[in-house]
From Swiss-Prot:
<dbReference type="InterPro" id="IPR000544">
    <property type="entry name" value="Octanoyltransferase"/>
</dbReference>
<dbReference type="GO" id="GO:0033819">
    <property type="term" value="F:lipoyl(octanoyl) transferase activity"/>
</dbReference>
<dbReference type="InterPro" id="IPR004143">
    <property type="entry name" value="BPL_LPL_catalytic"/>
</dbReference>
<keyword id="KW-0012">Acyltransferase</keyword>
<feature type="binding site">
    <location>
        <begin position="148"/>
        <end position="150"/>
    </location>
    <ligand>
        <name>substrate</name>
    </ligand>
</feature>
<comment type="pathway">
    <text>Protein modification; protein lipoylation via endogenous pathway; protein N(6)-(lipoyl)lysine from octanoyl-[acyl-carrier-protein]: step 1/2.</text>
</comment>
<keyword id="KW-0808">Transferase</keyword>
<dbReference type="InterPro" id="IPR045864">
    <property type="entry name" value="aa-tRNA-synth_II/BPL/LPL"/>
</dbReference>
<dbReference type="GO" id="GO:0005737">
    <property type="term" value="C:cytoplasm"/>
</dbReference>
<comment type="function">
    <text>Catalyzes the transfer of endogenously produced octanoic acid from octanoyl-acyl-carrier-protein onto the lipoyl domains of lipoate-dependent enzymes. Lipoyl-ACP can also act as a substrate although octanoyl-ACP is likely to be the physiological substrate.</text>
</comment>
<comment type="similarity">
    <text>Belongs to the LipB family.</text>
</comment>
<dbReference type="GO" id="GO:0036211">
    <property type="term" value="P:protein modification process"/>
</dbReference>
<feature type="binding site">
    <location>
        <begin position="68"/>
        <end position="75"/>
    </location>
    <ligand>
        <name>substrate</name>
    </ligand>
</feature>
<protein>
    <recommendedName>
        <fullName>Octanoyltransferase</fullName>
        <ecNumber>2.3.1.181</ecNumber>
    </recommendedName>
</protein>
<feature type="binding site">
    <location>
        <begin position="135"/>
        <end position="137"/>
    </location>
    <ligand>
        <name>substrate</name>
    </ligand>
</feature>
<feature type="domain" description="BPL/LPL catalytic">
    <location>
        <begin position="29"/>
        <end position="204"/>
    </location>
</feature>
<dbReference type="InterPro" id="IPR020605">
    <property type="entry name" value="Octanoyltransferase_CS"/>
</dbReference>
Length: 207
């Protein structure tokens, strides 16, 4: 099985989210899985069971209650978002395995830059020296998942000061540029997709 990879450029969060819902709701048993790469304008998203109290001060940034798991996170310019529209049932993948594949894909990407990163069992995502560099959340519907992982390449980090990232007060957040990697937002995209392919033993079809 192969993935169809779509580069969406910069796009507002809500239309992309609605498109993921529509894709998942209409897909058939033989619909190809897709990966969407996108950068969003500033937005805070709150998971299904997320506590609004974790948003300290939105500061005029839109807040969207979405249907992924997890608490609150920030998306904005300089952050690379990889959405995974995957038929887990067809691939015989559990949710935990998919989460692990996303985490390990980011860890593998960071290793290419000479950075040692790890996942945490108590707080999904990827961390470098205790600071979070990638957040993730999924929704499963009809045996298929959507949403995905967000990697901080070169975003402004002040927006994270206005929330408890992923529901954890005082959680440190970092980005590639603070770790000595000068990159534009979409530069790591191809390598991140390849790392995910390694984790899932798959092939890529560029769209």
């Amino acid at each position: 099985m192969a993935f169809l990879v779509r580069m969406l450029g910069r796009a507002d969060y809500e239309p992309v989210w609605r498109a993921m819902q529509e894709f998942t709701g209409q897909r058939a048993d033989d619909t190809a899985d897709e990966l969407w790469l996108v950068e969003h304008p500033p937005v805070y998203t709150l998971g299904m069971n997320g506590d609004p109290a974790h948003i300290l001060d939105a500061g005029g940034v839109p807040v969207v209650r979405t249907d992924r798991g997890g608490q609150v996170t920030y998306h904005g310019p300089g952050q690379l978002v990889l959405y995974t529209l995957v038929d887990l049932q067809r691939r015989k993948l559990g949710v935990r395995r998919m989460v692990s594949a996303l985490e390990q894909a980011v860890i593998g990407l960071l290793r290419q830059y000479g950075l040692e990163a790890r996942a945490r069992g108590d707080a999904p995502g990827v961390y470098v020296d205790g600071a979070k560099i990638a957040s993730l959340g999924l929704r499963v519907r009809r045996g298929c998942c959507y949403h995905g992982v967000a990697l901080n390449v070169c975003p402004e980090l002040e927006a994270f000061d206005r929330i408890h990232p992923c529901g954890h007060a005082g959680l440190a957040v970092t980005r590639l540029t603070d770790l000595g990697v000068e990159a534009q937002v979409f530069e790591p995209a191809a390598a991140l997709v390849r790392e995910l392919m390694v984790q899932l033993g798959d092939e890529e079809i560029a769209a």
